[in-house]
Design a protein with these regions (language model features):
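Short peripheral tails and domain-boundary helices/loops at the edges of structured domains
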Residues: 59-81
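Sequence-specific dsDNA recognition surfaces
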Residues: 1-2, 7-36
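Short, conserved secondary-structure segments in the cores of folded domains
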Residues: 30, 55-57
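Short amphipathic coiled-coil heptad-repeat segments
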Residues: 131-170
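Amphipathic alpha-helical segments
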Residues: 75, 79, 106-142
Length: 170
């Protein structure tokens, strides 16, 4: 049966072009099967990276991927965004006192806020509403970083050009 590994799991998406296959016993099938709506989280590789399985077809997962299935009072997308926050804040997979790996025990030890379901959905809606602005900000930040990196070299070249042309002497 085909299965996904951490190399197929990215933030909010899956790369399914290179699925591996292996035999799963009847005992392993339930534990290793993700269904639509499950939040899948990397234990290794890019620790904490997560995506929601949104396909109608079930898929098997390797043992380095955690499967989180929500209950009725939990919005899976809310927990996806919490994992994104925890990862980028360095609380999982970070340096120092952050969790270095994400074993099942480490995952169970994480504390998550759990507002009422309606509030979880409202938070998710606000995040989705602001995502285009965040993406635009990220693009501008990359451009600014590029300018800041290139500026000293461009300034040096410009000064040399002015000096060669004799424009620096009054």
């Amino acid at each position: 049966l085909p299965y996904i590994t951490t190399s197929n799991l990215y933030w909010d998406r899956f790369e399914l072009g290179n699925l591996r296959e292996m035999y799963f016993s009847e005992n392993e099938i339930e534990k290793c099967t993700a269904t639509k709506g499950d939040l899948l989280v990397c234990e290794g590789g890019d620790i904490g990276r997560a995506a929601i399985w949104m396909f109608d077809e079930d898929i098997r997962i390797q043992n380095h991927i955690h499967k989180l299935r929500s209950y009725t009072e939990v919005c899976t997308e809310f927990f996806y965004y919490l994992f994104y926050l925890y990862k980028h804040a360095g609380w999982i997979g970070g340096k120092g006192i952050g969790i270095q790996g994400l074993s099942a025990n480490a995952l169970h030890a994480l504390l998550f806020p759990l507002p009422p379901l309606s509030e979880q959905k409202r938070i998710v809606s606000k995040i989705k509403e602001s995502e285009p602005l965040m993406e635009k900000y990220a693009d501008v930040e990359k451009y600014l970083d590029k300018l800041n990196t290139e500026f000293p070299d461009q300034l040096r070249k410009s000064i040399l050009q002015e000096a060669v042309q004799g424009k620096l002497v009054p």
